[in-house]
C-alpha cells in the first residue's frame, strides 16, 4: 500500500477513486510522563516520553488507514493528512490522532 501526502503517486496513474479513507486512535499519556514533562519544561529540552507516544499513535493510525483503504479495494491512499488534538480536559491527558486521505487504485 502506497500512502502519500501528495495527490498523486509518482510514476503511476490513478485509475479509480474509491473514496474517503480514515483512521482514528485515542492515545493516553501517562501521569509519570507528565511529571517528567513538567520538569523538562522548566529547564528546556525534549520530552522523550511524549514523543514516543506520538510516534506510536501515528504508526497505529496509519495502519488503520491502510487496513480501511484495503477493505475498499484500494492499493494507495493519496492526499493524506494527520491531525493531533488534545481531548479530555481537566488533566485527562489524551490525544486524538486522526488521519484522512483518498483511497485510490493506481497502476
Residues covered by each model-derived region:
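N-terminal presequence-like segments and the immediate start of the first folded domain
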Residues: 1-33, 71-75, 86-107
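Short, well-ordered alpha-helical segments
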Residues: 21, 34-81
Amino acid at each position: 500500500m502506497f500512502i502519500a501526502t501528495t495527490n498523486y503517486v509518482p510514476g503511476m496513474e490513478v485509475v479509480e477513486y474509491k473514496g474517503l479513507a480514515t483512521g482514528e486512535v485515542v492515545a493516553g499519556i501517562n501521569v509519570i510522563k507528565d511529571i517528567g514533562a513538567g520538569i523538562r519544561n522548566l529547564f528546556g529540552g525534549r520530552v522523550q516520553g511524549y514523543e514516543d507516544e506520538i510516534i506510536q499513535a501515528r504508526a497505529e493510525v496509519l495502519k488503520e488507514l491502510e487496513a480501511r483503504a484495503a477493505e475498499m479495494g484500494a492499493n494507495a491512499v493519496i492526499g493524506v493528512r494527520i491531525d493531533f488534538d488534545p481531548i479530555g480536559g481537566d488533566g485527562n491527558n489524551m490525544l486524538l490522532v486522526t488521519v484522512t486521505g483518498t483511497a485510490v487504485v493506481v497502476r
